[in-house]
Amino acid sequence: MAKREHAATAALKRAQLFRALAPAALARLALNATALNLPRGKQLCRSGERCPGLYLLVNGRVMLSIGAPRGASKVIELIGPGGHIGLAAAVLGVPETVTAQTLADSSLLLIPCEALLDCAADNPGFALELVAELSRQVCGLISDIEAFSLHSGRERVAGYLLQTAAAGGARPRPVTLPAKKSIIASRLSLTPEYFSRMLHELIAAGAIAVNGRQITVLDPDRLRETSH
């Protein structure tokens, strides 16, 4: 196996989405995949454009957003290593509904739509995993709608910080926000000014400590009370 194909196979094997695939199926996908190395600020795809396939993020960070003709935009999701972009559009064969842009130098694999769907047709377990992943995305969007519609901005900030801290482990230790505070604010449907004000209030309450993009949850119980 060529070095490039070996690296692609290893990247696919690490991603949760492809865990149901046997080595031979992974190797076939890797053979059809294209490796991309993109600088920070590069667009992968734009809303309304044809979807060439599924992007698997190997390293880096990607922002998914929607925009209005007047220039306003809303961050939908931040994708980290092991995540993917374009699954729904690739499966349905429809144009992209979001714009994807790298927030850091990023390495990705592009799996063409035809190769992805052929793999699903040949591997029922993988097809079920695609259905499960699309279902998780729907549940996530419903949770977002609930938060944006029924939770205060303060509750959204507290909930996000608890979720971020939980990903960093049980002990209180600094965790780094995955993007600039203005981008996090947009993800939570808040203005940057409001997001900063909520951070200062939580600092004053002794719930968190902030050092740039590093945040330490000092009092999880107090933060949980704020998130409900």
Locate each region found by the language model.
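Cyclic nucleotide-binding regulatory module and flanking cytosolic helices
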Residues: 1-39, 84, 89-91
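Cyclic nucleotide-binding regulatory domains
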Residues: 17, 42-104
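Short aromatic/basic micro-patch
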Residues: 20, 78, 110, 178, ...
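ATP/adenylate-binding site constellation spanning eukaryotic-like Ser/Thr protein kinases
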Residues: 23, 59, 81-84, 105, ...
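Residues that scaffold the ATP/ADP-binding catalytic core of kinase and kinase-like folds
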Residues: 65, 87-88, 118-119, 160, ...
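Polybasic "coupling" helices that flank or enter modular domains
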Residues: 103-105, 121-192
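Phosphate-/nucleic-acid-contacting segments
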Residues: 162-228
